[in-house]
């Protein structure tokens, strides 16, 4: 039985790259993963239900197979969303956590705003929405 479970776990982990990036919502957890896996963190500030450039960035970059595959292997992705519609409301705890992230990394309230961090949370780059290909956006993040 243990052998079957171990085999299943190995199979699931090998499909991780095919499934796409996994979005974190907690910076401490993202930093821990980034430290263990030696990856930079991509912190995305967005208004998923009201910010037109945020929606374009999701559709044209984050949701593409090219970016999903690359990011799952090379980045730890964290999302700080600020939705306005009631149906998309976040928990109070997540809203507070996102506000703290904005205080630390997005003081000017820019949307979308993409911050590249090292595994300790130090800013190593910033960008926003650009009409470009996923490949070129990846080059900019790197």
Sequence positions of predicted segments:
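Short active-site neighborhood of thiol/selenol oxidoreductases, capturing the structured segment around
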Residues: 37-51
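Bacterial Sec-dependent N-terminal signal peptides
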Residues: 1-22
């Amino acid at each position: 039985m243990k052998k079957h479970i171990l085999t299943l776990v190995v199979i699931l982990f090998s499909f991780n790259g095919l499934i796409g990036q996994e979005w974190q919502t907690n910076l401490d957890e993202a930093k821990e993963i980034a430290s263990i896996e030696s990856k930079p963190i991509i912190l995305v500030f967005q208004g998923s239900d009201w910010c037109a450039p945020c929606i374009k960035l999701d559709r044209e970059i984050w949701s593409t197979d090219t970016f999903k595959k690359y990011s799952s292997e090379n980045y730890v992705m964290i999302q700080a969303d600020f939705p306005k519609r009631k149906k998309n409301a976040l928990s109070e705890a997540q809203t507070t956590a996102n506000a703290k992230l904005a205080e630390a990394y997005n003081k000017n309230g820019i949307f979308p705003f993409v911050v590249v961090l090292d595994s300790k949370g130090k800013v190593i780059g910033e960008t926003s929405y650009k009409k470009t290909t996923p490949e070129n956006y990846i080059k900019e993040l790197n």
